[in-house]
Amino acid sequence: MRYHMTLITFDERNQVFHLSNKTISYIIGLEKATYLSHLYFGKAIKRYHNSRKYPLIDRSFSPNPAGLPLKTRDFSLDVIPQEMPSHGHGDFRNPAVQIKQVNGSSITDFVYDSYEIIAGKPALKRLPATYVESDSEAETLVITLVDRLLDLTLKLSYTIFADRQVIARNSFLENKGQESVIIKKIASASLDLVSQDLELISLAGRHNKEREIERQTVQRGTRIIDSKRGSSSHQANPFIALVSSKTDEFTGTAIGLTLVYSGNHEMLVERDQFEQTRVMAGINPFGFEWELAPSQ
């Protein structure tokens, strides 16, 4: 059984979301009916045949998530390409969301709950954002994740436009529990890529010399481009691109990330032990704490 709309489909049998227009496709998988995985982002494809699943291999020091009744060691969040990684269940890379509880714990386990496909692009309350003038111009996929122990709901929004090579994303966290939590970090978007041949383009600068193009090979470890000035600033533009080594101004593969609304922001790129690259963009966690009370 397949649920069809013009730009977004859900393959119930293979548990795959496919966002696609005439030029691009963005594909999300559901692993073990529990965790979101990133499968593909690139040129448009007509149909996904479940051929890009990440290989399940027993990797030393990459543990199974505690909440799954697995009999083998071939599934670990430490290696699976994810959409919105959190902390405390076997993924030792940088998390996209980090919550502090009243008891001091920062462990969260956001698992899949449901999805909704919406015509158009819902507005963001009190925030500037991309928009459409007609619902026929775009469609939006909203995936709901839940942490059942903390009773937190995390909604991930993905908008694909009919005639743009763009996926617009945002994150919405709601506390349905009985105790307040402190948001230490929450990214607007996170993306894991298995490509090994990547370079990072960023736009540094200073007064009267803005947007100087810097390009460097993505090495193992973490590279952060951020602003702590209270604004996006000309010192650290809230834009980066991951490109292949052969990409130039006219041809080649490129994935760009930019924040539409930014004050103190962080653009993070991490290459792990398996040569995979995690990239995320959002509010700078430096000096950031937000108390999320019950029902907020």
Identify the meaning behind each predicted range:
Residues 1-4:
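Short, Lys/Arg-enriched N-terminal segments with co-localized hydrophobic residues
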Residues 10, 15-18, 22, 26, ...:
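Polysaccharide-binding surfaces and accessory modules of carbohydrate-active proteins
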